[in-house]
């Protein structure tokens, strides 16, 4: 048995271990679309807020509910798109969408998101709206950092960027919507585009 064959065998074993323990079917296109959804949602929210300022007789509770449903709509669209595109990519790569890797990834991602979601609901209940945008960015970034162990390692850079942006948003209070657009909109589009190029380069190397 020559040295090159041994190295090939080791490489194949590492690949199999990665496939079983990591979720490698994230789609760059889902990141781009999530960014577009976020920008569209933020634009609609901006219009609603400006309309409320113009017509101050409107009940603030109505505005709160409208903004809440806009956020939920963006979240549902983003998650649905990510699940669909990841499923199609996993099917193409013969990877189990509900395998050990995806379970590890989901648990690591959802734990900070659920904790952050509960914290944000408490902020809403206490009517502390000014730090909601920074809080969403920070908890989302932490979720990506935790989940990066179980997927493409490069996702941790997006996580760091989201956390830092959230801290900046906490410092520059009153510009939450702008930071939200940058973090959930433009950062997602940039990262999704880079992920597509990264995956194409990997495919070329493996050919």
Question: Where does each model-flagged region fall?
Answer:
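Selected alpha-helical membrane-embedding segments in polytopic membrane proteins
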Residues: 22-113
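N-terminal juxtamembrane cytosolic/stromal segments of multi-pass membrane proteins
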Residues: 1-27
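Helical transmembrane-bundle signal
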Residues: 35-45, 75-82, 113-117, 137-140, ...
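Alpha-helical transmembrane segments of integral membrane proteins
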Residues: 29-32, 69, 104, 131-138, ...
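Transmembrane helix-loop junctions in multipass membrane proteins, especially transporters and channels
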Residues: 46-54, 87-94, 124-128, 149-153, ...
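Membrane-proximal helix-loop-helix units in multi-pass membrane proteins
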Residues: 94-148, 152-155
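Terminal transmembrane helical module of multi-pass membrane proteins
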Residues: 140-207
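Membrane-interfacial loop-to-transmembrane-helix junctions in polytopic alpha-helical membrane proteins
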Residues: 19-26, 60-67, 97-101, 122-132, ...
């Amino acid at each position: 048995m020559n040295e090159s064959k041994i190295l090939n065998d080791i490489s194949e074993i590492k690949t199999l271990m990665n496939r079983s323990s990591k979720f490698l079917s994230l789609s760059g296109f889902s990141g781009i679309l999530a960014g577009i959804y976020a920008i569209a949602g933020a634009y609609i929210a901006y219009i609603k807020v400006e309309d409320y300022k113009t017509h101050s007789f409107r009940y603030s509770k109505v505005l709160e509910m409208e903004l809440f449903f806009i956020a939920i709509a963006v979240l549902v669209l983003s998650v649905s798109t990510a699940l669909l595109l990841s499923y199609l990519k996993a099917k193409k790569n013969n990877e189990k969408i509900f395998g050990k890797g995806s379970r590890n990834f989901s648990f690591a991602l959802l734990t900070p998101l659920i904790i952050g979601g509960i914290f944000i609901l408490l902020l809403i209940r206490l009517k502390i709206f000014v730090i909601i945008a920074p809080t969403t960015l920070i908890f989302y970034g932490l979720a990506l950092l935790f989940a990066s162990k179980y997927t493409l390692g490069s996702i941790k850079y997006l996580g760091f960027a989201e956390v830092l942006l959230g801290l900046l948003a906490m410092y520059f209070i009153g510009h939450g919507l702008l930071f939200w657009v940058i973090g959930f909109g433009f950062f997602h589009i940039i990262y999704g585009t880079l992920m597509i190029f990264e995956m194409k380069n990997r495919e070329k190397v493996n050919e």
